[in-house]
């Protein structure tokens, strides 16, 4: 155990068993930066070095993802290969090991529910034992398993994948979308996260970017990004609230906009509340009604449940614009009496009754955010709605009742976050110069102290980047090391908060208790990610810190996942090359056979037979296309094309000579006729 550096020890922290630290406040407050200093650091942080190439803004969403780039002073949302501006955050693995991302993955979910991953953002940076993960296990058809580091991972066909990997596959799709538009490699990115994400979740998101091959310049909060999208072209000063209810998370942020400075005053939220919960609530209602009417329980039938899940999502969306919808699922299941069909009418009022508790859960965080920002609802000049769930009329009414004003629909709820990320990318690249973003840390940071109490060092809603230091000392004679448990959260007891890591300070020179002065510095960067360092004030030497992470991906894990992602990218490239070669070959076969039929009278029979043999060989090659390379198929197709061109060239020459022959004989007959007429 270590004690405070002051003569009178104010309190002991940690337990004797853990040899924990003891801390004391300095007379002038924490040995760190003042609030004004935070602002200076924040401003300086945006004076980035020159960044080469475009910076893409990516909204890595729970349900859908979106990518945008800056074009001049405007952000442009990009369409994917399917022509859509948003991409489902769905990844699937087929029986033959093929990986599908986006809409192709979503389309086959009904027939492959156990190996189709959706809403995995809810697992990112979480431990397997987290209550939210245990709840999710009961609701999804795919397997969520405990990884060797205790984190929650997913399993498909016996292979384990971290949620960061699944996120990386989606990011690779977004990267590809950007590259197709830009015409060159996209390397730099700004990725958004829910404002209420903790350090582990932010780090795991950054890892996902690294695995996908992106250089993540900044991780920014989704509501803040939406505020940038809203306020970029606004000149008036005002306080705004951003109410962000997306597919998996809920955030509320209060911001003050003044002459291009976007300062977050407070943020709050719930990282396990969103559209997925609305879908799940409606699914449970449908399954319950179906059992009441037919006596059949669908809960053990994953394929039927996936159909109901998709129908529930569709009904939810329809009820935002209609007061009633029909849910029709023919041949949903069957029992001894035959097939069972689902036919149900659902009104908007019924749906609102089913999800009313979920909507109510957004109220307390909003009230807390206003309280932390020290503003009343009359001070808020605009309420911005972000996230697909804010299209629901009941949600809009709740927001209006809460803030006392009709919410603004000035931004597209699906695209605003990606647009804001692209604007932030423009700021970092130096293309956008009149914008400054001052964000905050959403959760308090501190250490475990005596009796398991959580002692805060950096309070929530502190402007970031920020740095605060505290001096510790030993609590026993001759003590050479001490363990510090760093936590993040708002609960009074450390055990109820998120354990970020256990930091063991070693190599402390043996001395009487209270003599060594070890300055431990807690630093939160502009991404909201926590760093910890320690220094012996007596010698000026940096002390060695052994970090025992409470989970997350190691450097080796990330390197392996990068290699796997590159392997998948190479496989995708080879597959695309093979598909293009097969299409080319089939086109050549079709054209050759058509021309052979058209010119059969002009072609030598033996040459035709040779060409037919070539076509047969080509068809045999295509029959085993999955084991052939695209290059082999392309070469064989080119050979067939050359052979057919030579043959048809012969046919054309023969036809031309026949035409000339018939033309000259016809001219002779005309001359004879003319002679006869003259006579």
From Swiss-Prot:
Residues 656-679 are annotated as: Disordered. Residues 432-441 are annotated as: Interdomain linker. This is Stress-70 protein, mitochondrial. The N-terminal nucleotide binding domain (NBD) is responsible for binding and hydrolyzing ATP. The C-terminal substrate-binding domain (SBD) binds to the client/substrate proteins. The two domains are allosterically coupled so that, when ATP is bound to the NBD, the SBD binds relatively weakly to clients. When ADP is bound in the NBD, a conformational change enhances the affinity of the SBD for client proteins. Residues 432-679 are annotated as: Interaction with FXN and ISCU. It is found in: Mitochondrion; Nucleus, Nucleolus; Cytoplasm; Mitochondrion matrix. The modification Phosphothreonine is found at residue 87. Interacts strongly with the intermediate form of FXN and weakly with its mature form. Interacts with HSCB. Associates with the mitochondrial contact site and cristae organizing system (MICOS) complex, composed of at least MICOS10/MIC10, CHCHD3/MIC19, CHCHD6/MIC25, APOOL/MIC27, IMMT/MIC60, APOO/MIC23/MIC26 and QIL1/MIC13. This complex was also known under the names MINOS or MitOS complex. The MICOS complex associates with mitochondrial outer membrane proteins SAMM50, MTX1, MTX2 and DNAJC11, mitochondrial inner membrane protein TMEM11 and with HSPA9. GO terms for cellular component: cytoplasm; mitochondrial matrix; mitochondrial nucleoid; mitochondrion; nucleolus. Belongs to the heat shock protein 70 family. Residues 1-46 form a transit peptide. Keywords: Acetylation, ATP-binding, Chaperone, Cytoplasm, Hydrolase, Methylation, Mitochondrion, Nucleotide-binding, Nucleus, Phosphoprotein, Transit peptide. The modification N6-succinyllysine is found at residues 135, 138, 206, 300, 368, 394, 567, 600, 610, 646. Residues 1-432 are annotated as: Interaction with NFS1. The gene is HSPA9. Its EC number is 3.6.4.10. Pfam families: HSP70 (PF00012). The lineage of its organism: Eukaryota, Metazoa, Chordata, Craniata, Vertebrata. Mitochondrial chaperone that plays a key role in mitochondrial protein import, folding, and assembly. Plays an essential role in the protein quality control system, the correct folding of proteins, the re-folding of misfolded proteins, and the targeting of proteins for subsequent degradation. These processes are achieved through cycles of ATP binding, ATP hydrolysis, and ADP release, mediated by co-chaperones. In mitochondria, it associates with the TIM (translocase of the inner membrane) protein complex to assist in the import and folding of mitochondrial proteins. ADP binds at residues 63-64, 313, 316, 320, 388, 391. It comes from Bos taurus (Bovine). The modification Phosphoserine is found at residue 408.
């Amino acid at each position: 155990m270590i004690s405070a550096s002051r003569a009178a020890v104010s309190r002991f922290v940690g337990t004797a068993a853990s040899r924990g630290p003891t801390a004391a406040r300095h007379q002038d407050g924490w040995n760190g930066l003042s609030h004004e200093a935070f602002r200076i650091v924040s401003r300086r942080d945006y004076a980035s070095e020159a960044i080469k190439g475009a910076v893409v803004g990516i909204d890595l969403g729970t349900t859908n993802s979106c990518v945008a780039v800056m074009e001049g002073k405007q952000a442009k949302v990009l369409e994917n290969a399917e022509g859509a501006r948003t991409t489902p955050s769905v990844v699937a693995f087929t029986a033959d090991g093929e990986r599908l991302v986006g809409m192709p993955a979503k389309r086959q979910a009904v027939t492959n529910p156990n190996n189709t991953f959706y809403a995995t953002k809810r697992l990112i940076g979480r431990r397997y034992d987290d209550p939210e993960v245990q709840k999710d296990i009961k609701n999804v058809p795919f397997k969520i398993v405990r990884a060797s580091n205790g984190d929650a991972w997913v399993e498909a066909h016996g292979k384990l994948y971290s949620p960061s990997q699944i996120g990386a596959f989606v990011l690779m799709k977004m990267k590809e979308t950007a590259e197709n538009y830009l015409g060159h490699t996209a390397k730099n990115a700004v990725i958004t996260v829910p404002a209420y994400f903790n350090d582990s979740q932010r780090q795991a998101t950054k890892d996902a970017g690294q695995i996908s091959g992106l250089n993540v310049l900044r991780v920014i909060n989704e509501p803040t990004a939406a505020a940038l999208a809203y306020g970029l072209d606004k000149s008036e000063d005002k306080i705004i609230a951003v109410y962000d209810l997306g597919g998996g998370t809920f955030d509320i942020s209060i911001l003050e906009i003044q002459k291009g400075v976007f300062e977050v005053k407070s943020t709050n939220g719930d990282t396990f509340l969103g559209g997925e919960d609305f879908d799940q609530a409606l699914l449970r209602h449908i399954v319950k009604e179906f059992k009441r009417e037919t006596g059949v329980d669908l809960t053990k039938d994953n394929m039927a449940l996936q159909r109901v899940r998709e129908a529930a999502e569709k009904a939810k969306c329809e009820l935002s614009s209609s007061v009633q919808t029909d849910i029709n699922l023919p041949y949903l299941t069957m029992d001894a009496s035959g097939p069972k069909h689902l036919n149900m009418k659902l009104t908007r009022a019924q749906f609102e009754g089913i999800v009313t508790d979920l909507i109510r859960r957004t109220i307390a965080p909003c009230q807390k955010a206003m309280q932390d920002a020290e503003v009343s609802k009359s001070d808020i000049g605009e309420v911005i709605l972000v996230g697909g769930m804010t299209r629901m009329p009941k949600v809009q009414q709740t927001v209006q009742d809460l803030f006392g004003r009709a919410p603004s629909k000035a931004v597209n709820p699906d695209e605003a976050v990606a647009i804001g990320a692209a604007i932030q990318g423009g700021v970092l690249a130096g293309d956008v110069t009149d914008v400054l973003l001052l964000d905050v840390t959403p959760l308090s940071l501190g250490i475990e102290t005596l009796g398991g109490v959580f002692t805060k060092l950096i309070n929530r809603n502190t402007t970031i980047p920020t740095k605060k230091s505290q001096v510790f000392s030993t609590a026993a004679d001759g003590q050479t090391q001490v363990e510090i448990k760093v936590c993040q959260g708002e609960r009074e007891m450390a055990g109820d908060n998120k354990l970020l890591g256990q930091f063991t300070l070693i190599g402390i020179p043996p001395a009487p208790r209270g003599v060594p002065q070890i300055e431990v510095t807690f630093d939160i960067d502009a991404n909201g990610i926590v760093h910890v360092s320690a220094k012996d004030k007596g010698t000026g030497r940096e002390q060695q810190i052994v970090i025992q992470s409470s989970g997350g991906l190691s450097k080796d894990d990330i390197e392996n996942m990068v290699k796997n992602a590159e392997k998948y990218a190479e496989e995708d490239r080879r597959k695309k090359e093979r598909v293009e070669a097969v299409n080319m070959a089939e086109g050549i076969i079709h054209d050759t056979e058509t021309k052979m039929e058209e010119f059969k009278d002009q072609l030598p029979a033996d040459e035709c037979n040779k060409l037919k043999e070539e076509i047969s060989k080509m068809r045999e090659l295509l029959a085993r296309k999955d084991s052939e390379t695209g290059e082999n198929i392309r070469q064989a197709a080119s050979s067939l094309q050359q052979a057919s061109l030579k043959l048809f060239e012969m046919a054309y020459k023969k036809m031309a000579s026949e035409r000339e022959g018939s033309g000259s004989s016809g001219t002779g007959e005309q001359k004879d006729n003319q002679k006869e007429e003259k006579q």
